[in-house]
Regions:
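A cross-family phosphate/adenosyl-ligand binding-site feature
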Residues: 1-136, 141-428
């Protein structure tokens, strides 16, 4: 099991399958949840067994799979025998959540009306509502999803306190294209991890810059750096999981957008500044993790420079002159709201800077924090961690230095988000 695994450790999940072609994705979801440390108890409807076998789900979950309330060999989530042969009661006792994936239009309608004519609907109805949340991953044809009856059902289920995940869009098994597809297993897993994450940043709007910038020399060449953006993207994911509204301003990287995050793609430092100033107006926390180029070519060519001089520009090695790029962190941190954030005033923007150094990390980080005018500066040794999945961080404020030892960037991002929430006086 990898270091990133274990985010569902200790969780007991009842995975329900209703009938639908998307049942094949449930196999991958089951495997992924088990890999993350969860105990997974699978319950299938009769219709689901037309699309996926019990043998497959039993092999992946490592547990007996149930399909009928009359199964007389039932065991509970905790592995104990059910002496009273009431799996619709016992399977949910001690469970942390029930997730139905796929959840068909028919099964949603059944839940809405409180019908209980099979084991899966029975255990959903009999679950302790305050203790065992119910999560649905819809899967159906686009017309079925768009049908007013389905949309009314979804709205009422949400009003009843049931979590209904969004649907995917794209090619469907019937040959049509549109929304209504069940999310992919990794998307559902991410949503499930977020569901269990304490909402320490609920009500906050976090603005994050990530990745490198690209400064053009001519239309096909430019100057950039080795930043992968992985740290910033990990922070964006962790902040969204903690309940924040997150806007991620990303330089030129090829990373997937974290679930629940609004992404704004930019290229140059000037582009990033314009976007940063725009979105800082509504943000309450600004985290500047991007590796912004300090300089840019003063006069980028409007056509490709030719070595042989055929472009009429003389050929040979181009003579480049540079101008300084805008200081994005300082510009936002020294704004009126940024200054309020530094002093801890109400309505301020709490700014967090990053320093990627090659040596003398502590002294350089301390100096940069003062120079930029931010309450918190995060330092790391850049050349050793660019593009890597692991890092070590140093959190520097006016009075203390806190070391976050070598760990995955995912784990470090979670630690950083928890630290920021604590500094803002919110529960972690």
């Amino acid at each position: 099991m990898s270091e990133l695994s274990g985010e569902l450790k200790g969780k007991h999940i009842v995975l329900g399958l209703s009938g639908g072609i998307a049942a094949y994705k449930a196999a991958e979801l089951c495997r992924a949840m088990v890999k993350e440390g969860a105990t997974v108890q699978v319950v299938m409807t009769e219709a689901a067994e037309h699309f996926m076998t019990k043998v497959t789900m039993q092999a992946l979950s490592g547990r007996q799979v149930f399909g009928s309330q009359w199964d007389d060999t039932a065991v509970s989530v905790n592995g104990e025998g059910i002496a009273n042969n009431m799996p619709h009661i016992n399977l949910t006792r001690g469970a942390d959540a029930i997730i139905i994936a796929p959840c068909s239009a028919d099964f949603m309608a059944k839940l809405l009306h409180g019908r209980a004519d099979d084991l899966l609907s029975l255990l959903c109805l009999a679950r302790p509502i305050a203790e065992v949340p119910l999560i649905l991953a819809p899967a159906m044809n686009r017309e079925m999803w768009a049908n007013p009856a389905t949309q009314r059902n979804v709205a009422q289920l949400k009003q009843d306190g049931i979590t209904v995940l969004e649907v995917g869009e794209g090619d469907q098994a019937c040959g049509e294209v549109g929304d209504g597809r069940m999310l992919e297993a990794d998307e559902i897993l991410a949503d499930l991890i977020a569901f269990f994450t304490p909402k320490s940043l609920l009500g906050q709007h976090v603005l994050i810059t990530a990745g490198p910038t690209y400064e053009a020399i001519d239309p096909v060449r430019g100057i950039t750096n080795l930043s992968s953006g992985k740290m910033g993207f990990a922070i964006a994911r962790a902040a969204a999981e903690a309940g924040a509204d997150v806007t991620l301003i990303a330089g030129p990287v090829s990373l997937p957008t974290p679930r629940g995050v609004k992404r704004v793609d930019v290229k140059s430092a000037q582009n990033m500044l314009l976007a940063g100033v725009k979105y800082a107006d509504v943000a309450t926390i600004f985290i500047a993790s991007a590796a912004v180029a300090d300089w840019r070519p003063a006069n980028p060519a409007d056509q490709k420079l030719k070595k042989d001089g055929s472009d009429g520009l003389g050929g040979g090695v181009p003579q480049l002159s540079f101008v300084e790029n805008p200081d994005i962190l300082a510009t936002i941190a020294q704004s009126p709201r940024g200054k309020k954030g530094l002093s801890g005033e109400q309505g301020g923007l709490f700014c967090v800077g990053f320093a990627a150094e090659s040596q003398d990390l502590l002294s350089n980080a301390q100096a940069k924090r003062i120079r930029k005018g931010v309450p918190l500066l995060v330092g790391n040794i850049g050349p050793a961690t660019f593009g890597q999945d692991h890092n070590a961080l140093l959190l520097v404020d006016a009075n203390t230095v806190k070391e976050l030892p070598q760990a995955s960037k995912r784990h470090l991002a979670q630690q950083l988000v928890a630290d920021i929430a604590a500094r803002l006086g919110q529960k972690t």
